[in-house]
């Protein structure tokens, strides 16, 4: 099972997302269930190694946000067109 540490995003929008990517992080969102969608930021280097394994897409993942564990599945992964970089991930609550 994969466990990912995340932080709640303070800023949203194109400029904020670009600043995150320049800082070796990237935006993501957790949605689904009865709770409101949660915009988060993830560390790129940690997640890029995890997503190289097929289990990342098929198993339930645990994301820790502010000490609270959220069970999710990866729904959509957006990659850079030619660089080996992740741009954004959508997670759906499990």
UniProtKB/Swiss-Prot annotation:
Keyword RNA-binding carried by entry: yes
Protein name, entry field: Large ribosomal subunit protein bL25
Subunit structure as annotated in this protein's UniProt entry: Part of the 50S ribosomal subunit; part of the 5S rRNA/L5/L18/L25 subcomplex. Contacts the 5S rRNA. Binds to the 5S rRNA independently of L5 and L18.
Biological source species: Shigella boydii serotype 18 (strain CDC 3083-94 / BS512)
Protein task: This is one of the proteins that binds to the 5S RNA in the ribosome where it forms part of the central protuberance.
Gene designation per UniProt: rplY
Any Gene Ontology CC annotation: cytosolic large ribosomal subunit
GO aspect biological process, one term: translation
Keywords: Ribonucleoprotein, Ribosomal protein, RNA-binding, rRNA-binding
Cystines in this chain: none
UniProt similarity note: Belongs to the bacterial ribosomal protein bL25 family.
Domain of life per record: Bacteria
Molecular function per GO: 5S rRNA binding; structural constituent of ribosome
